[in-house]
Amino acid sequence: MSEQSPRDPVAASENRKPSFRFDADIFKLCTRYLEENNYHGLALIARQKGLPPFLRLRIWPILLKHHPFVLNPFLQPDNDVLNKPKHDSDQDDRAEGQLNDEDIRFNIKKDLKKYVQRLKYNSSPDINEIEMEMLEVLEKAIFKFVKKWGKIIKYDQAITWIALGLAEWLPPIENTHWVLIGRDVSSSDNLYITNIMDEYSTYIENVPDLEDYLNDVIASPQMKFSDVFERLVLVLLHSPENRTRSPSSKVNKTTLPLNGGTIEDRVSFFIYCLRKLLPELSDYFQEEQILNKFGSNDDEWLIWWLKWCGSKVWSRMDRGRIWDMILGWRLQNPKKSTAYYQDKLKLTKHQLEKLGPDVFWSVSQHDEETVDERGEPDEFKKSDSFKDLLHGLSMANISASSSNTNSPSESTSPLLTPTRRSSSSSTSLSEGIDDMNIPFSRLDPHIELVFISLALLKSKEGTLVELDQHEIRQFLSRLPTKSYNYTTRYQKYKQMKMEKEKEEDNGNGSVSSEASNSDGGSQIITNDNANSRRYDFMDNVVNEAGELWRKWFWSEAVDNE
């Protein structure tokens, strides 16, 4: 993003508007699901396309309420909690809790103050009444969580940063539109809060009656911020139960993608995949002593990425898109038929085509005649070792589902199969029902995050290889946003192209949208100003993560021959 003076109200206002584009049909589907409180449909859109940012304040609480990790929570206990000797009486526990309360509150306030100082560039910033009230809500929510779950995980500054990340999209003060502004932009009046509706005003103005609809959404009853925050932490920090925590235990690469693992497992898996998928960057990291002595504070950026799901270190926009995926993560219940979900979702084939397959799809061991995207035979299906690897993943998935009825892992459709649908344009739900495969999640969400993190590194590889050790760690600890301004030259090219297309279409195009020819006449509504066009490449990063997953999967198949 181009640098603008925080004292220039015009520049700051323009700079503050984030890039956002969304298919009009999917947006209508999203609002329909929201009105119906259809959490199945909202989860589907969240994981496939991401959510309209200005609707997260209402949709995230719904997704969290019904998330499998909230219905059946499990947090990986801290090592010092695991090794802590049991007290002989409850009195010792109460005494320790009383002693820690003041310290916990002090630490929470201190970490909240760091956020304010970071945005206001002042060690003693002035705080207005609304900002003060927001900080009080955050402090109470964090303290409430620590008091409830403190015997499993102790307070860490990252818990406060998760609350701050939530407050960047969910107004802490009920029935208001005030959210934290984030670190990507500066405020002309030195505020660290913003009206989320003003941020997306260009988009909202392009959709008839949307402003009134959003005002009704804000005015309606909402879940308390503290309750949403607790559920969010349970999802982001979820860990599978009954894992062997011995330091000498090896990561099982055939079960980890589906069952997930501890943060130690995921870090080891990340480094392994980095060496295999991005060898040149991995070699450069090794030269610069990056990730060579993991466990110290030198490379704590990776813990922020993988354990704390990008809190603090990722930009507000990028992190919001990834949290959409995590909150929308759902496995298909093996006890429910395809017809059950189709009845719940009421999707047409055209809508399913727009939503696309699960990002982390792969081939199925059950398909005898698997073809690639060009319709040609898929050669690597001939590898018995590939089938063995896939069979191992299948068995791990079935085992996980049988041990956890609240978050079933087995799918009634072939495991790890890309969604392939008929090219028919029929929209009848009664026709071709077997072809309408609804895209459910396949991998554990924290393993998805591993591949997303690798894709982020790949997108920044050209920059990283030009930096030294200190600069690399600083860069990865404050990753720039993927949304950037188009160059003037490209703006002129785009304008000429749009004018030419408009002439060819005899002026039939929509003024408030960008036509997407590849989507068969889709209408794409944008939040970008015509004179300051930007584009958010986070969807490209997500898609690249899927490609890296398949590349890793194929590589493992070849290596096991």
From Swiss-Prot:
Q: What coarse category fits the chief subcellular location reported for this protein? A: cytoplasm
From the broadest rank down, the organism's phylogenetic lineage runs: Eukaryota, Fungi, Dikarya, Ascomycota, Saccharomycotina
Q: Where in this protein does the record put region Disordered? A: 399-434, 498-529
Q: What organism does this protein naturally occur in?
A: Meyerozyma guilliermondii (strain ATCC 6260 / CBS 566 / DSM 6381 / JCM 1539 / NBRC 10279 / NRRL Y-324)
By sequence similarity, the record places it as follows:
Belongs to the OCA5 family.
Annotated TM spans: none
Q: Where is the Rab-GAP TBC domain?
A: 50-330
Q: Where is the composition biased (Low complexity)?
A: 399-430
**Cellular compartments per GO CC:** cytoplasm
Q: Where in the cell is it found?
A: Cytoplasm
Q: Do the record's keywords include Cytoplasm?
A: yes
Q: Which InterPro entries match?
A: Rab-GAP-TBC_dom (IPR000195), Rab-GAP_TBC_sf (IPR035969)
Q: Which UniProt keywords apply?
A: Cytoplasm
Matching SUPFAM superfamilies: Ypt/Rab-GAP domain of gyp1p
State the name under which the record lists this protein: Oxidant-induced cell-cycle arrest protein 5
Q: Disulfide pairs?
A: none
Instruction: Specify residue ranges for compositional bias: Polar residues.
Output: 507-529
Tell me which domain of life the UniProt entry assigns to the organism this sequence originates from: Eukaryota
